[in-house]
Structure formats: C-alpha cells, structure tokens
C-alpha cells in the first residue's frame, strides 16, 4: 500500500499527515541546503553590518558573526570549496562502510544471517530484538548508523513484518538512543574529557570519568528498548499497513549452501576477533596506546571503523567463496560497485551540506546562537527541575543546527557544568542531560549527514518517499524518547540512585 498517504482517523494520524504534507513541500535536500546557504550568507551580512554580537558568559569576550558576503568571506570560500567537500568527515567513513556492508549484502551474507537470527525469534518480539541489537551496536560509534537500519529492515522481512517498521526501529535505536550504551564507548571518552575541562573552572580537582554515566545509560538501554518496541508495534507499523513487496524481496529458507557459508563465516569471524583481541587484551598489545598502554584511548578505539570495514571484507569474502557467489577475482570489485551506485544520490546531497556546515562554522553562527541562547537561559535564574528541562531543550534545539554533538557540548559545558555545580549537582549529571537531548533529536536534525542516508534507506522500500514521508514516520520516536528519558532521569534524581559507580546526581 502507499505510504504517501497513511490512513488514520485519529488526531495523531492527522498530525502525522500534516507533517508529511508540509515536509514533502520542502525542496529536495540538495536544493534545501543551497537555499539555506543563501539565507546564511544574507543573515551573516546583516548581523555583521549592524555589529550584532553575543557575550560569552565564560570569559566575557564578544562572539562576532563573520560576513560570508565580504571580501574576507570570498577569500576563505573559494580555496576551500573542494576541501569542504572532500574533508567532510562523515563522507569518507560512510562510503567506506558501505563498501564493506554492501559487499556483505551482495554476497548474501547479511540476508542469510538475518534469516538465521529470525528463525530463533518470534515475529512478535522482532521490534525489541532490533532495538536491543541497535543499542549494542553503538560500540562501533557512527558505523552503527550506517549498518543497522538496513539490517533492521532485513530482520523484519525475515519474520514476515513490514521492512520499513524494522528500518525505523533500527534508526530509533542507533539514532534517538545513540548515547545509551551497555558498554563504555568513544562517546563516553569524548564527552567526559570536555566535562572535566569545564569543571576545572569551578573545582580543579573535579574529574569526570568515562564510567560516571554508566549505570544510568546502561539502564536506559532496557527502558528505551521497551519504549521503542511499543512505539514500533503500536504506532508505526499499524500506520504502514500490510507489506506488499515483490516476492523476491522476501527472505526465503536457508539452503544447505547458505548454511555452510554461515558456518565458514562464523569460524572466520571468531578467528578475526581472536586476532584483534590478541592485539588489544595483553598489556603490551600493539593496538593499545603505545605510551600509557590503555585501551581508551588507543589506536584500537581510533581505528574501530577501519577494523569493522576489514571485518566485513574478510568475512564476506569467506562466505562468498564458500557459497560460490564469488567465483573469480573479478567478482569482488563488481559486487562492491553495485552498492556504491546506490550512494550516488547521497554523495550529491553531501556537497551543499558540507559547504553549509563549513560556512556555518567559519561565520561563527553556531557559536553566536549557542552563546546567545545559553546567556538567556543562564540569566533566567532557573534552578532544579526547570534548569534540567531548560538545558535539555536548549541542547535539543542546538543539535538541530550543529551536526557535531561534541562541538555543542564544547560550547555548553563551560557554562552549564559550573552553573550546575554551583547548584549542587555533579558535572556528570549535566552531561547526562546533554546526552539525552543530543541523542533524541539526531534522526530529525536537518544538518546531520545521516538524515539523507536514512531517507535513501527508506526509498529502497518506498521509492516515492520524500523528506516529509521520512519525518512523519520517524517523528514519534524522538518525541517520546525525549519525554520518557527525561522522566526517567527525573525519577532517578528524586530516588537518589547513582548514575555511575560512586557518582550521584548531587555533589556530596
């Protein structure tokens, strides 16, 4: 059935329909960012002409907007157009991951693996399985945002459910719940370092450890898995109707060749993991930090994405040879070319997106907006629960316009960490508030390079889907996740539970 007009007689259905209609009137993402660049250029020219600035509450220095339409702006822009595009960090990582994951899909490894997994899962609980796997996949950082959504769709296909529902459930897990982790991951390392630096302004002895949010974030995985599963089953899938894809899109029973291939792939996977473990677990492992011999940070953590790509290549090659989907050397590049063709639209969209992000950063607009809004919130005199909500809403708003969560926290932490400490709260508690807000709205952020990617995934199953279709379908997850997560944190605070080992919301 068509998803461009999703049936519902309820008020919520009318809301989603309105969001879809409005969203579908938004120009193609390529044109959208062209228009945003024009608006940004005019805005910087006006603010610069009138000498508008914002006062940085941290050191009192003015934050001035730089004019993109000035001679200085032109001199910066022309030599950096190609650099802005080729140096756009997510582009290389996404394309490289698609090479690996695309090969795994083309040789038949991922579909076979999904059928194998689905054979042990009741279709009724598929939503919860997809979400839980998505949360666990955060150990691979941004790679999870590329790998998990297509896998979620395949899992739902395997159990006879709508693939778009599986796709959206996976996006919710890797996107809305990006910072909810069972394990300590790179996000913990990055944010805790920023928080420690910010706390030093108030108390030089204060240290925010990588495990200071662990109890709360690990518990969040359980809560959000349940919440996300209910959203998928009760809200999303009923709106999609019955999946009416072609018969060849449905995953079939595994053949003997596929079973043999999975066994070979499993053995190779274990050997690969064992080899990496031997380079990481020993104190003198070659993938540990060469000076401090730590795992976090280390070449292993910094190189996690290349290692995942290599893992895909090695295991896919083993499966392909075992099942004879790879018969000769020439098959390998051919199989990798096909998934890259599907990324052409994404690459085109990234060009203006990369220019917009670079221009936004160079002009100081991001810092100007952040500092201005932060100053308003700080001067409002909020404390306690209103301060919690204020920081969360401010963070959510900024995350819609600044793609890097660490960049936003670098701006907010120097103001809010000392402010929360003055109110008697641990800096790790302020950090949790930011993490909740940052994660929840990730699938909605128009400047995120992953939104066009998610739209491309959706168009595999709904070719005529537009940005409005995507937003109307994914919208319940960010809204409900944000509310439930904040309520969970409020309950955690009121009960007085530790948010990490020996760390409580309030300073002792």
UniProtKB/Swiss-Prot annotation:
Indicate the secretion signal residues: none
- Recite the UniProt keywords alphabetically: Amino-acid transport, Cell inner membrane, Cell membrane, Membrane, Symport, Transmembrane, Transmembrane helix, Transport
Q: Name one Pfam family in it.
A: ABG_transport
Give me any GO biological process, just one: p-aminobenzoyl-glutamate transport
Extract the GO molecular function terms from the UniProt entry. secondary active p-aminobenzoyl-glutamate transmembrane transporter activity; secondary active transmembrane transporter activity; symporter activity
Q: How does it sit in the membrane?
A: Multi-pass membrane protein
**Per the entry, what modulates this protein's activity?**
Completely inhibited by 100 nM sodium azide and by the proton ionophore carbonyl cyanide m-chlorophenylhydrazone (CCCP). Is also strongly inhibited by 100 mM potassium fluoride.
Identify the InterPro entries for this entry. AbgT, AbgT_Proteobac
- Spell out the coiled coil positions from the record: none
Keyword hit for Nucleus: no
- The transmembrane residues are 30-50, 85-105, 121-139, 140-159, 164-184, 211-231, 261-281, 303-323, 343-363, 382-402, 405-425, 439-459, 479-499
Summarize induction of expression. Could be transcriptionally regulated by AbgR.
Predominant location of this chain?
membrane
Where found, per UniProt? Cell inner membrane
Its UniProt miscellaneous note says: It is suggested that in wild-type strain abgT would normally be cryptic or not expressed under conditions of growth on minimal medium. Altering the expression of abgT from its wild-type context appears to be the mechanism for obtaining the growth phenotype.
Q: Tell me, what does this protein do in biology?
A: Essential for aminobenzoyl-glutamate utilization. It catalyzes the concentration-dependent uptake of p-aminobenzoyl-glutamate (PABA-GLU) into the cell and allows accumulation of PABA-GLU to a concentration enabling AbgAB to catalyze cleavage into p-aminobenzoate and glutamate. It also seems to increase the sensitivity to low levels of aminobenzoyl-glutamate. May actually serve physiologically as a transporter for some other molecule, perhaps a dipeptide, and that it transports p-aminobenzoyl-glutamate as a secondary activity. The physiological role of abgABT should be clarified.
PANTHER family in UniProt: P-AMINOBENZOYL GLUTAMATE TRANSPORTER, P-AMINOBENZOYL-GLUTAMATE TRANSPORT PROTEIN
This protein is called what?
p-aminobenzoyl-glutamate transport protein
Which source organism?
Escherichia coli (strain K12)
Q: What is the lineage of its organism?
A: Bacteria, Pseudomonadati, Pseudomonadota, Gammaproteobacteria, Enterobacterales
């Amino acid at each position: 059935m068509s998803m461009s007009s999703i049936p519902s007689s309820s008020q919520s259905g009318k809301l989603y329909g309105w969001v879809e209609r409005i969203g579908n009137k938004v120009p193609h993402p390529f044109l959208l960012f062209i228009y945003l660049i024009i608006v940004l250029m005019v805005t910087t020219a006006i603010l610069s002409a009138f000498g508008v600035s914002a006062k940085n509450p941290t050191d009192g220095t003015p934050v001035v907007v730089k004019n993109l339409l000035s001679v200085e702006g032109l001199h910066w822009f022309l030599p950096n157009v190609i650099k802005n595009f080729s140096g756009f960090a997510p582009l290389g990582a996404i394309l490289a991951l698609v090479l690996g994951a695309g090969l795994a899909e083309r040789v038949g490894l991922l579909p076979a693996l999904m059928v194998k997994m689905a054979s042990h899962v009741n279709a009724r609980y598929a939503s919860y399985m997809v979400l839980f796997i998505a949360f666990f996949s955060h150990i691979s950082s941004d790679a999870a945002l590329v790998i998990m959504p297509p896998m979620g769709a395949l899992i739902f296909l395997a159990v006879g459910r709508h693939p778009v529902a599986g796709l959206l459930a996976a996006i919710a897990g890797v996107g809305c719940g990006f910072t909810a982790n069972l394990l300590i991951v790179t996000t913990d390392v990055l944010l805790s370092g920023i928080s420690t630096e910010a706390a030093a302004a108030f108390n030089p002895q204060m240290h925010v450890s990588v495990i200071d949010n662990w109890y709360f974030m690990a518990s969040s995985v359980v809560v959000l898995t349940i919440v996300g599963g209910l959203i998928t089953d009760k809200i999303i899938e009923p709106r999609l109707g019955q999946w009416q894809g072609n018969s060849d899109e449905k995953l079939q029973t595994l053949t003997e060749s596929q079973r043999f291939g999975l066994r070979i792939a499993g053995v190779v996977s274990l050997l690969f993991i064992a080899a990496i473990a031997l380079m990481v677990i020993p104190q003198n492992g070659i993938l540990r930090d060469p000076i401090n011999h730590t795992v976090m940070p280390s070449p292993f953590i910094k190189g996690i994405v290349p290692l995942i790509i290599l893992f895909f290549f090695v295991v896919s090659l083993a499966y392909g040879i075992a099942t004879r989907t790879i018969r000769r050397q020439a098959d390998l590049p051919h199989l990798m070319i096909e998934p890259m063709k599907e990324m052409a639209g994404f690459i085109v969209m990234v060009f203006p997106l990369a220019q917009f992000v670079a221009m936004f950063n160079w002009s100081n607009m991001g810092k100007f907006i952040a500092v201005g809004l932060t100053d308003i919130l700080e001067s409002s005199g909020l404390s306690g629960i209103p301060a919690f909500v204020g920081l969360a809403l401010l963070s959510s708003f900024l995350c819609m316009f600044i793609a890097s969560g660490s960049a936003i926290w670098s701006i907010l932490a120097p103001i809010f960490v000392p402010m929360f400490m003055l109110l008697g709260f641990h800096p790790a508690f302020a950090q949790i508030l930011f993490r909740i807000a940052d994660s929840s709205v990730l699938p909605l952020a128009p400047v995120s390079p992953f939104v066009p990617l998610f739209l491309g995934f959706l168009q595999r199953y709904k070719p005529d889907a537009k940005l409005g279709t995507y937003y109307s379908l994914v919208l319940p997850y960010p809204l409900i996740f944000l509310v439930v997560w904040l309520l969970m944190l409020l309950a955690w605070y009121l009960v007085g539970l530790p948010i990490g080992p020996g760390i409580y919301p309030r300073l002792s």
